[in-house]
Curated annotation (Swiss-Prot):
It comes from Mus musculus. This is eIF-2-alpha kinase GCN2. ATP binds at L595, G596, K597, G598, A599, F600, G601, A602, V603, K618. (Microbial infection) Kinase activity is enhanced by alphavirus genomic RNA sequences. Kinase activity is stimulated upon binding to uncharged tRNAs. Activated by serum starvation (in vitro). Residues 1-26, 661-784 are annotated as: Disordered. The gene is Eif2ak4.
Length: 1648
């Protein structure tokens, strides 16, 4: 029993131990998992008495913590002793964020789970289930409406960020994919190359055979370099050629029978008359002159790439036998001597230059087998000769003849004043260029060469008979005789060959008297050109005030009335056949049809007799004394600049004057009062109808209290005048070079110079009113004085493009509204034309259907710009001021509003009203809205209906459309019309905005088909069509002419080794400065993909690779470097680079312009320091100090800040979203791409007010010291917070930089220029320029040496897709190194630059081996040395070679010298020679070089010290030179004369010496005792001989050189005194610097 009980007890104890172990293990695991959230609730958990587990777990949602947890609960589990076989007790306490229902639900779930897990440990499973439940119910508590709003906004922001991140990731993936694809392509390309290489090795012979058989021989023929007549484009791209098929220049001469083949091209060299040898490509023959025996060719001068004319004479002989006899040789030698005499004469002719003579450039003669060819290069004149005019055009009008005569006399007088006689003045030797300028050619030399070459050299002397009936008169009076005959021929339209000369009596009296003074038989009575210039024919006394001639009037003729039939033109004037001959209108044109006539004038359809094309000629009666005439001239000037396919072209304009008998009671033509005009004559120009005129007359007049004319600009009155012409052509080229430079000047506003316009308070109708008054006055005069008197009438003729079809008014009346596609196409073309004229800063202001024409191809042509102008805005205040003197404003019966611009039904409200509001180009858009409605609406039958409908449309509140227009078919039309007719101009669109609007349907298929195909092809770069297009593009043939001219301006053939040496010296000097700052040279890749964000103005030179990808050459060195820094994650670097940058050419098929730019950049990870900027500026200051030529120019430093510029723009009312556009406009203004008026027009298109523009100019024109500008800058701080913060930040940066520059010792003037705009889109922070003012072509112009700034924000734009990390600070400067080259080259004292230190010369061929070994030793020792390749050169040739290459030392190696070498020195213009052992040569040369370098360093240090002492940074005078401050240098002057001098003479010589050497002494002065001057009475050549004296050695060597000197020169006694004095100064006194000065020749040399 006992044993049984014991057994039974052990059996019960085993499960008990198993429970406790399992419980302990679970508790340990839970504690490890939950850590601090686990709590054992047993009071004595580790006591001896074992209790069942009772724990508490604090549970949260699974995987969450912190702010994301909104719910939690505590799980209490109390286990029985037999757990886990028995379910434990479960409780949930301290629940947060859970409702009671949720807690009960969770508890029920736990109880069910516990039952299922019975028999297994389950607390962890229960806890995990609780956490899962909490995760599902983890929701934030309800929030307030404000919190929900903020949360929603945060979510939206987060969504946007996610979307942006997604797009960025997509772009990154695309970039990475493209990178990977290109890597694969590179691998495939390598494989293909290997395979292709193997194939080429196998089939090389077959390939060569195929290539030879398929090669096109025609492709190797050289094309003609110079072609004949080129097409002249007229109108809408239509080409017309001259009737003769030749260029205007070719028609100067008769056809050349012996014209060479088009492929011939000879190269000629000219030396006579030119300082440098000229190389010329001889082109095709353009004519010959039998009288002068010459042939004329076109030619191209290679150095400048300019066209010239080549006049060629051939002196021919025929040999009687195989060899020349002595007599024949003597005759040939005689001819050669005559040609040499002609060359001597020609040397003086090339110096002649006058606007009315053709310049000679060079002459050359060359001997061939049986002839001598003489060539003369002359100026190329684009025009015709008067002989051609005589043969084709007949008589020259009197007015034009007067102009020709005055210019001929001016040129002839210039020749005579220079003792040059023309000898053969005739119609063929007078040219007239395109501007009407007369130029005399073939003077003097042509007659002489013609006489030499006229007959065979060996022909026997015989009597010659002249074919001319006129005697030949010689001398200057003979030129006047021939001038009279020429003028008589021009007036008659044919050559005058009778003798004695008879002057027709029907010529004007003053012209008859003028001709008598020219062709009188007695030479003594014949007037000179100077006397003839004062004749009354040249200087007439006009009855009416004459109009000032301008370029527009250069083709002006005497007036002659048109010959329109009387039934078409009732007011046609009377004319005679003689008067008709003087009219350019009748000479050049044939009348076809009267197109229209009205108050403003008549429009006539004519045909040009020369080209056969039809034109429309507008004939306008004018009064030359009126202000309105000046206005018309200005308008014609403006209109001539327009060239667009949708604008009527204006070709020529001229004035004709005619005196006719005035019939009493008859008004002048086109001056009939409007009330008397019949409907047929008082209409308008082409296409108008009587019905339209009546409609306009019935239109209600607008409310108007003053003349509706406008002022020239927002801040100028209406009388502001703009100069007519800008600079001359050379200045334009010079300005273009400046614009194409490394950078442009700062914003320096200047007066515009585009036109000479005074826009007065007159318009078309007020002008008619004035004409009516003139007519009334004339009528009154006739009543008082009924006799017939001569009356002068002036007409302006304007030659315009002729539109054959109709006007838009005709098209509207024919039912345009039915053809919707045509309607939209025409509307788009009108918008294109308006956008063009608005871009040019002009306003039409009279836009209506009758002023919009349609050509034969049904394309729009906007015309009738009679009231167009190009001013910025108009204010009514100016109108009222100007109205005061012009009388009362009325409506005239023609339907127009007098004083009103445009027609009442189309004029915009701001023009029509009387308020003081400004208007701009949008007035045309309002008129277009009315026009577009008429295009879209059915033709209105009656005038009253049209007036009513259009007035309803002009309602100020909103347009009121007719009921039958308000349907679904016109939805887009209504939207466009409502937008255009908005009475608020700010809300009205511009033409460009409307073109880009979605309201306009896409272009029609016939217009856009090609563009669509191209767009589709370019969009699919992997398609077959794209590859085919690229293949065709790269298969283009390049002609030899294009190949030659492509880089002709770069390869000019004028290479100079000295220029290259100077460039190398400058570069080495600049690099030395950079290296002192720790910079390293770093060059970036040449090509970049096209980047529109960086280069927005298409200023980069773009190219296309074989795949069609657009790449660009570097515009500057900054952008490629920023890209390089970004891609390589560079944080700290100082680099310099001297590389080429490129500018695109305006002309096609030209090599991009190359400029050499030097860049210096500092990249640092320090972001809050201004020291890098100051160091960059200081570096440029150091470079200036290295070059004396730059120190003399007095450079100033201009600073600005991009934030300060932004603050100014914001302060001036410019919206922040338009800042980028304003930067572009200001930058274009700085680079002079836009005139000031164009800038104003572009600002106006941005809807900026005139007040904003005035404030802007007020700020950007400010510059000065920081202290002086601080009040102006501080005035911005008082503005809104954003502007104030920008100003404070920028002001602090400017103060820091200015302070650092002072600490660094920068002595240049530092100024703040608020108008400095230098690549603002690229820079962020300080920007700066180094600028000086220099005098160029009689005007002071700014010259920029360097410019730069901070560009931190440019680097992130080039970062890769996966690049992270800080962005460094970067500051850089660009230096126009070409300007430094030019400054050093143009120094008064030329800089000595040598290509090597020593030249090794072998004396004889046997010594060449020794010379080679010696040169190798010099190279090894680090001495730059050259070896003379030609050992046979003479001593003179050797010296010339050393002089040309500026080599100082020469080593002569000869076997006769044994182991010695002769070393010749050419230092300081003296020659010395010394024998040195060959083994000691290296040491000897190095010692010489060290001495030379030390002397140069001492001289440079002395100059630098002087410059630092005297440099004050002040602008001393207009030339930009520094004033020399400090102590005046007064050295010891010794005057040594051959005879005794008086005290006054000696004093005069001393003053002369000190004045002459003042500047040089100031630069060399260190101590007064170390500089002395010896003034002697010797010539310049003798002074140079003293440089051979050797005073550095002992006395014996000095005496030896003195004996050598005296043996070569006379006056030995005086020379011995000079040598003794030199010995006393240099040897005994040991004076370091001695000036040997010749007061006879004012010449000196320095003896160091």
């Amino acid at each position: 029993m006992a044993g049984g009980r014991g057994a039974s007890g052990r059996g019960r104890a085993e499960p008990q131990e198993s429970y406790s172990q399992r419980q302990d293990h679970e508790l340990q695991a839970l504690e490890a998992i939950y850590g601090s959230d686990f709590q054992d609730l047993r009071p004595d958990a580790r006591g001896r008495v074992r209790e069942p587990p009772e724990i508490n777990l604090v549970l949260y949602p699974q995987g969450l913590a912190g702010e994301e947890v909104y719910v939690q609960v505590e799980l209490q589990v109390k286990c029985p002793p037999t757990y886990p076989d028995v379910v434990p007790e479960i409780e949930l306490k301290n629940a947060k964020g859970l409702s009671n229902e949720s807690v009960n639900l969770l508890k029920s779930h736990l109880e069910e789970l516990a039952k299922k897990q019975c028999g297994e440990v389950m607390i962890f499973e229960l806890a995990h289930h609780v956490q899962s439940f909490l995760s599902e119910h983890n929701k934030p508590p309800p929030k307030s409406f404000h919190e929900e709003m903020l949360e929603r906004q945060a979510q939206e922001k987060q969504q946007r960020l996610l979307e942006a991140r997604r797009k960025e990731e997509q772009e990154q993936r695309e970039i990475l994919h493209e990178i990977q694809r290109r890597k694969e392509e590179i691998k495939e390309e390598k494989k293909r190359k290997e395979m292709a290489k193997q194939e080429r090795l196998e089939i090389t012979s077959l390939t060569n055979q195929d290539y030879a058989s398929k090669r096109d021989p025609a492709g190797h023929r050289a094309a003609a370099i110079l072609h004949g007549g080129s097409p002249d484009f007229v109108g809408n791209g239509k080409a017309r050629t001259y009737s003769s098929g030749r260029s205007r220049r070719e028609r100067q001469y008769s056809v050349c029978s012996g014209e060479p083949s088009p492929g011939s091209c000879d190269i000629l060299h000219f030396s006579v008359g030119s300082p440098d040898q000229l190389m010329v490509h001889k082109g095709r023959c353009v004519g010959s002159d039998e009288q002068l025996g010459k042939v004329v060719y076109n030619a191209l001068e290679t150095a400048t790439g300019s066209f010239v004319l080549l006049h060629e004479w051939v002196l021919q002989w025929q040999k009687m036998g195989p060899c020349l006899t002595s007599q024949e040789k003597e005759k040939i030698d005689k001819c050669k001597r005559q040609i040499q005499g002609a060359e001597t004469e020609f040397s003086s002719l090339v110096k002649l230059s006058h606007p009315n003579i053709v310049r000679y450039f060079a002459m050359n003669s060359r001997e061939e087998e049986d002839s001598i060819v003489i060539d003369i290069l002359a100026e190329h004149v684009s025009g015709i000769s008067l002989a051609t005019h005589l043969s084709h055009s007949g008589p020259v009008p009197a007015h034009q003849l007067r102009k020709y005569t005055a210019q001929l006399l001016a040129g002839l007088d210039y020749l005579h004043s220079n003792s040059v006689v023309h000898k053969v003045l005739s119609a063929s030797s007078v040219l007239v260029d395109a501007e009407g300028t007369v130029k005399i050619t073939d003077y003097s030399i042509s007659k002489r060469l013609a006489d030499i070459c006229k007959e065979d050299v060996f022909e026997q002397a015989r009597v010659r008979f002249s074919d001319s009936a006129l005697p030949y008169k010689t001398g200057k009076k003979g030129d006047v005789w021939r001038l009279g005959l020429l003028l008589l021929s021009l007036s008659q339209g044919q050559e005058c060959g009778e003798y004695p000369v008879t002057i027709p009596s029907d010529l004007p009296a003053d012209f008859q008297d003028f001709l008598k003074k020219c062709v009188c038989l007695d030479d003594k009575e014949r007037w000179s050109p100077q006397q003839l210039l004062k004749h009354s024919f040249i200087n007439p006394q006009p009855k009416l005030p004459l109009v000032e001639q301008s370029p527009e009037d250069s083709g002006g003729q005497d007036y002659i009335e048109t010959v329109i039939p009387s039934n078409q033109l009732p007011s046609a004037a009377f004319f005679s056949e003689t008067q008709k001959q003087f009219s350019r209108y009748f000479i050049e044109f044939e009348e076809l049809q009267l197109l229209g006539k009205g108050a403003f004038g008549a429009v006539i359809k004519v045909q040009n007799k020369l080209d056969g094309c039809c034109y429309a000629v507008k004939r306008i009666p004018i009064n030359p004394a009126s202000r309105h005439f000046r206005r018309i001239k200005g308008e014609v000037t403006l209109l001539s600049r327009l060239h667009h396919e949708n604008i009527v072209r204006y070709y020529n304009a001229w004035i004709e004057r005619h005196e006719r008998p005035a019939v009493p009671g008859t008004p002048p033509p086109d001056c009939t009062p409007q009330a008397q005009d019949s409907p047929a004559t008082c209409g308008k120009t082409s296409g108008d109808t009587e019905e339209l005129g009546s409609v306009e007359a019935a239109a209600p007049p607008p409310i108007l209290s003053s003349s509706v004319e406008w002022s020239t600009s927002a801040e100028r009155s209406t009388s502001t005048r703009f100069p007519v012409t800008g600079q001359d052509s050379s200045s334009d080229e010079e300005d273009e070079d400046e614009r194409d430079g490394v950078f442009s000047q700062s914003f320096l506003p200047a007066s515009d110079s585009d036109s000479d316009i005074i826009f007065d308070n007159e318009d078309e109708n007020s002008k008619s009113q004035n004409q009516d008054e003139d007519c009334n006055q004339k009528d009154g005069s006739h009543e008082i004085e009924p006799s017939v008197t001569a009356e002068a009438v002036h007409y302006l003729y304007i030659q315009m493009e002729y539109c054959e079809k109709s006007t838009l008014r005709d098209t509207i009346d024919q039912g345009l509204f039915r053809d919707t596609s045509r309607l939209w196409r025409l509307f788009r073309e009108i918008l294109d034309g308006l956008a063009y004229i608005h871009e040019k800063g002009m306003i039409h202001r009279d836009l209506k259907p009758v002023n919009i024409f349609l050509d034969s191809d049904d394309h729009v042509k906007i015309g009738d710009f009679g009231l167009a102008t190009d001013h910025l805005a108009f204010t009514a205040e100016g109108k009222q001021d100007d109205q005061a003197g012009d009388g009362v404003i009325k409506s005239d019966p023609s339907g127009h509003l007098t004083g009103m611009v445009g027609t009442a039904l189309y004029v915009s409200p701001e023009v029509q009203g009387s308020t003081k509001s400004a208007y701009n180009q949008k007035v045309d858009l309002f008129s277009l809205g009315i026009i577009f409605f008429e295009m879209s609406y059915h033709p209105m039958v009656t005038a009253s209906e049209r007036i009513f409908v259009l007035n309803q449309l002009r309602d100020p509140t909103s347009p009121k459309f007719p009921d039958d227009f308000d349907d679904g078919e016109h939805t887009k039309q209504k939207s466009v019309i409502s937008w255009l007719l908005n009475h608020d101009p700010a809300k009205r669109p511009t033409a460009m905005e409307l073109l880009k609007s979605e309201l306009l349907p896409p272009p029609q298929m016939e217009e856009s088909e090609l563009h669509e195909v191209l767009h589709h092809t370019l969009a699919n770069i992997d398609g077959k069509a794209y590859r085919t297009m690229m293949s065709q593009i790269f298969c283009q043939h390049i002609s030899p002419a294009i190949d030659y001219t492509y880089d002709s301006d770069i390869l000019k053939g004028n290479f100079l080794i000295r220029t290259a040496k100077i460039q190398q010296l400058v570069c080495e000097t600049i690099v030395r400065v950079f290296k002192r700052h720790g910079a390293v040279q770093l060059c970036t890749p040449l090509l970049l993909p096209r980047n529109r964000q960086i280069y927005e103005h298409n200023e980069a030179a773009l190219f296309m690779d074989h795949s069609g990808m657009l790449v660009m050459l570097p515009f500057d060195l900054r952008v490629p470097f920023a890209r390089y820094v970004a891609r390589n994650n560079i944080l700290n670097l100082k680099r310099y680079c001297i590389e080429r940058v490129f500018r695109p050419r305006k002309l096609d098929r030209f090599h991009p312009k190359e400029l050499l730019e030097c860049a210096f950049d500092i990249v640092t990870s320090t972001t809050n320091s201004s020291l890098p900027t100051a160091e960059t500026i200081y570096t440029i200051y150091e470079i200036i100090q290295e070059f004396p030529a730059l120190q003399e120019r007095n450079y100033s430093i201009y600073l600005n800040h991009t934030m300060l510029l932004k603050a100014i723009l914001l302060h001036c009312g410019i919206p922040e979203d338009k800042l980028s556009q304003v930067y572009v406009i200001l930058y274009d203004a700085v680079t002079e791409k836009l005139t000031r008026r164009e800038v104003e027009a572009k600002f106006c298109n941005l809807s900026l007010s005139s007040n904003s523009l005035c404030r802007l100019y007020k700020f950007i024109e400010q510059k000065g010291d920081l202290q002086d500008l601080t009040p102006t800058i501080n005035s911005l701080i008082k503005q809104k917070t954003g502007v104030a913060q920008l100003v404070k930040y920028s002001l602090k940066d400017l103060e820091d930089v200015v302070g650092l520059l002072k600490k660094l010792g920068v002595k240049l003037q530092v100024s703040i220029n608020l108008g400095l705009v230098y690549k603002v889109q690229q820079h962020t922070g300080i920007i700066f320029q180094f600028l000086a003012f220099s005098k160029r072509r009689q005007r002071v112009v700014p010259e920029i040496l360097a410019a730069g700034g901070r560009y931190d924000l440019l680097i992130p734009k080039f970062r890769g897709p996966q690049t992270v990390g800080p962005v460094p600070t970067a500051v850089g400067v660009s230096i126009a190194i070409d300007k430094i080259f030019a400054a050093v080259l143009n120094m008064e004292e030329p800089v000595t630059v040598s290509s090597c230190d020593l030249l090794v010369v072998s004396v004889g061929q046997m010594s060449m081996s020794r010379a080679i070994n010696l040169t190798q030793k010099l190279w090894t020792a680090g001495i730059t040395a050259e070896i003379m390749y030609d050992w046979s050169q003479s001593q003179e040739e050797l010296q010339e070679y050393c002089r040309h290459h500026e080599i100082t030392y020469v080593a002569l190696v000869s076997d006769k010298e044994g182991s010695h070498v002769k070393v010749k020195s050419f230092e300081k213009e003296r020659q010395t020679e010394k024998r040195v052992l060959e083994s000691d040569l290296v040491d000897h040369v190095m010692q010489k070089l060290r001495t030379k370098v030390g002397d140069e360093r001492n001289f440079r240090d002395a100059s630098d010290n002087l410059a630092v002492q005297t440099l004050k940074g002040s602008f001393s005078n207009a030339s930009g030179l520094f004033e020399i401050h400090g102590t005046t240098v007064v050295p010891n002057v010794i005057v040594l004369a051959p005879e005794k001098l008086s005290a006054s003479t000696r004093r005069r010589h001393e003053i002369q010496v000190q004045t002459r050497l003042q500047t040089t002494l100031a630069n060399l002065h260190q101590k007064s005792s170390e500089i002395e001057i010896l003034a002697v009475d010797l010539p310049k050549e003798t002074i140079l001989q003293f440089l051979s004296l050797e005073w550095d050695a002992d006395e014996q060597a000095f005496n030896t050189t003195v004996k050598q000197l005296l043996s070569r020169l006379p006056k030995q006694r005086y020379l011995k005194l000079v040598c003794d004095e030199i010995y006393n100064i240099k040897v005994e006194k040991k004076v370091s610097v001695l000036f040997l000065y010749s007061y006879r020749d004012d010449y000196y040399r320095i003896l160091f």
